């Protein structure tokens, strides 16, 4: 039996690692151990419930306004104790969070192989996104198995000197999760407030580098788009960060056709996205998920580590400039050809069977 420990701490990690955990649980040659760090405890728990993931350990590190250094050090120390007790054959981490980096370091100190799910993404700008770009680069220096979502991310790793035999193009597990969560008969109170003929725009924005002036610029653009285009309704699940909530409430809080709602669980979000006309986001995971829904995505960032979607035509980088965001949205609202050029493309990120591939590759690697 191979003991495989899966470690994650945030909502996006939970969504993307849940299919892997389920695939591990369904394999009778594997002993799975699941650890959550609690980096985003309040937002993570609903994901665990939806996918029926029952952690064996919870570090419960969540504290208000703690620094990145404190998060990283608490995970590093907490994982030291768990790895000493469990002695897994391999540790799986995901993506680019502080949990990812600290867990990889702790496993390295214990001479335990690390498998990096969603390896090889790069912007080549260490401060964009911050701190994620450096987290994933450092994790990829430590890892032993690299599960790259696309050929481009695999090539990034090989160009950095990673052995080709240790790099595997698997697709992205978020597509596996999307197949699990979409429901044809989905209902939500938010949808009851929006006339079917209205064009629903789904907005998400929360990244550290966008907080403050960039976020305010985007929100003002959204406000004016709604005022000038009566067919538009905006749904914005507002992140729990006080820095996000205060600006959202100040600029968007009193507009009838802007619906500021609590953060949505993954089922609600995926199904609202599937019914949207357009999505604006600074999220990484959404850039991968939503092209499967044939919904155009405007990315509220200046850089992306997911250029495959841009190259495929499903995503467009628009940054946070007021005029640029406003023009991009209104172009898609009023130009059917432009809209169809973005909507009618295939998703380059996977087929929904990534988790199965990863488990198979782990078993091969450990033999």
Model-derived segments and spans:
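Membrane-proximal helix-turn-helix segments that form the acceptor-binding/catalytic region
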Residues: 133-145
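Donor-nucleotide binding loops and adjacent catalytic segments primarily
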Residues: 40, 45-47, 66, 184-275
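Conserved nucleotide-sugar phosphate-binding/catalytic loop shared by glycosyltransferases and other
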Residues: 29-74, 78
């Amino acid at each position: 039996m191979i003991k495989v420990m899966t470690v994650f701490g945030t909502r996006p990690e939970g969504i993307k690692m849940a299919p892997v955990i389920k695939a591990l649980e369904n394999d009778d040659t594997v002993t799975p151990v699941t650890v959550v760090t609690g980096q985003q405890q309040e937002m993570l728990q609903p994901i665990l419930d939806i996918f029926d993931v029952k952690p064996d350990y919870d570090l419960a590190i969540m504290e208000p306004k703690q620094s990145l250094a404190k998060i990283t050090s608490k995970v590093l120390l907490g994982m030291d104790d768990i790895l000493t007790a469990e002695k897994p054959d391999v540790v799986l981490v995901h993506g680019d969070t502080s949990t990812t980096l600290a867990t990889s370091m702790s496993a390295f100190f214990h001479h335990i192989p690390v498998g990096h799910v969603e390896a090889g993404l790069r912007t080549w700008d260490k401060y964009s996104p911050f701190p994620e770009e450096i987290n994933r680069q450092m994790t990829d220096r430590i890892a032993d198995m690299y599960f790259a979502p696309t050929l481009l991310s695999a090539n990034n790793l090989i160009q950095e000197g990673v052995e080709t035999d240790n790099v595997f193009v698997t697709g992205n597990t978020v597509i596996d999760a999307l197949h699990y969560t979409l429901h044809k008969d989905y209902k939500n109170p938010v949808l009851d407030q929006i006339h079917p003929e209205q064009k629903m725009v789904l907005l998400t924005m929360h990244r550290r580098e966008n907080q403050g002036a960039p976020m305010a610029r985007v929100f003002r653009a959204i406000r004016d788009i709604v005022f000038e285009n009566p067919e538009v309704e905006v749904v914005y699940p507002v992140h729990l960060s006080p820095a996000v909530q205060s600006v959202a409430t100040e600029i968007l809080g009193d507009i009838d056709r802007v619906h500021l709602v609590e953060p949505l669980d993954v089922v609600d979000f995926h199904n609202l996205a599937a019914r949207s006309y357009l999505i604006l986001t600074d999220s990484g995971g959404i850039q991968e998920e939503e092209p499967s829904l044939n919904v155009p995505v405007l990315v509220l960032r200046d850089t992306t580590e997911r250029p495959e979607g841009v190259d495929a035509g499903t995503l467009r980088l628009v940054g946070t400039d007021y005029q640029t965001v406003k023009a991009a949205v209104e172009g898609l609202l009023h130009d059917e050809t432009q809209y169809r050029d973005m909507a009618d493309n295939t998703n380059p990120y996977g087929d929904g069977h990534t988790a199965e591939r990863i488990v198979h590759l782990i078993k091969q690697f450990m033999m």
